[in-house]
Amino acid sequence: MTATTDLSRTWPRRAAVLSLHTSPLEQPGTGDAGGMNVYIAKTSAKLAELGTEVEIFTRATSSDIPPVAQLAPGVTVRSLLAGPFEGLDKNDLPSQICAFAAGALRVEARHDPGYYDVVHSHYWLSGQVGWLARQRWGVPLVHTAHTLAKVKNAALAEGDTPEPMVRVMGEEQVVAGADRLVANTEFEAADLIERYDADPEAVATIPPGVDLERFTPGDRSAARAEFGLPADAVVLGFVGRIQPLKAPDVLLKATAALLDRHPGLRERLVVLVVGGPSGSGLERPRALHELARSLGITDVVRFLPPQRGDALASVYRACDVVAVPSYSESFGLVALEAQACGTPVVAAAVGGLPVAVADGVSGLLVDGHETRRWADALASVVLSPGRRARLAAGTTGHAAGFSWESTTEALLDTYARARTTFDARLRIREVTA
């Protein structure tokens, strides 16, 4: 199931990348933009550097967005009209699959036959479009799910909304129809095989990477000064979309418990919550503020909007610990970015986080989401400078094992394997026709 690069391959001249529900041009950390946006942007740019031109198809969400934009040299983003710009909830997007597919097919029709060599779809909505494009364009389909409905529904946060059956059925169709499936970790690969009956030979395990040039250790005092934080503060951080799935409430509840046990810590403690509302979190965008107020910790909690680029790296550097308490996470790029900056991570032992975080080496993994356990884990790091230093020493070495270059090389290998599968399926169909 693990992709290798020893297979001789023909690199595709041009790849069509489908991302219906969110654009790589959007700011991660708010709305539906997150790790998937980073993944698409980084791998597309690296594919172009390696000689494969990339066209990314996404849905237009504003009249201010140009229909065609350049993300990086050799990478074009096409924003297609499919439904209204505003007021369309993510749960309503299945109604726009046909409109989006029609837009993509019209773009391809303006080119000579065989213009695209491979289709790579991201998330199940795009997978449905990729399923159709595969048939119409006669090219292999590679699909990356990023999240899976059956996995999310098996680990719902309290008060969160289950993924609908239409998504489950859509994912099952894409899994069956794709020539190659990309899983972020062996855990996700197992979910595809066991929960979705994927062919084990069709699943490639390719971990995401991290930008090791941007996310590096730096001056903590300088980073804290950027956000007006005292140099001697004890800083806990959360970075991500504000929604039940990402569980920032777990961090706030653990913070309250930590202060109950160690009231003297209040004078120095700062909890940074960096991100914007998303998904079911949009239903009550102020819910986390209300929780902080009810817990009596508004004096230590600071809310910041999503941060870009170097500012995001400064957030990680400013923290003593970054918490990733998600209920479900196919990988966890935030955890990897924080470690690349030299900051230990305390994360939930779910999904791909046991791969993203080396337990006891670069951070700690916590079983479950019980407040007491999280307070214990956080206390064991922030109240023990020696332990924090030992974990910090293991962060950059662990993060160095993940690069976008290696991710993209493995994707190219997977594209070649997908072509082999596609050709074999085509021959079988011709023989049985």
From Swiss-Prot:
It holds the Pfam family Glycos_transf_1. Its EC number is 2.4.1.250. It catalyses: 1D-myo-inositol 3-phosphate + UDP-N-acetyl-alpha-D-glucosamine = 1D-myo-inositol 2-acetamido-2-deoxy-alpha-D-glucopyranoside 3-phosphate + UDP + H(+). It is an enzyme of class 2 (transferase). 1D-myo-inositol 3-phosphate binds at H21, D32, A33, G34, G35, M36, N37, K90, Y123, T147, R167. The keyword RNA-binding does not apply. CDD domains: GT4_sucrose_synthase. Keywords: Glycosyltransferase, Magnesium, Metal-binding, Transferase. Homodimer. This is D-inositol 3-phosphate glycosyltransferase. The gene is mshA.
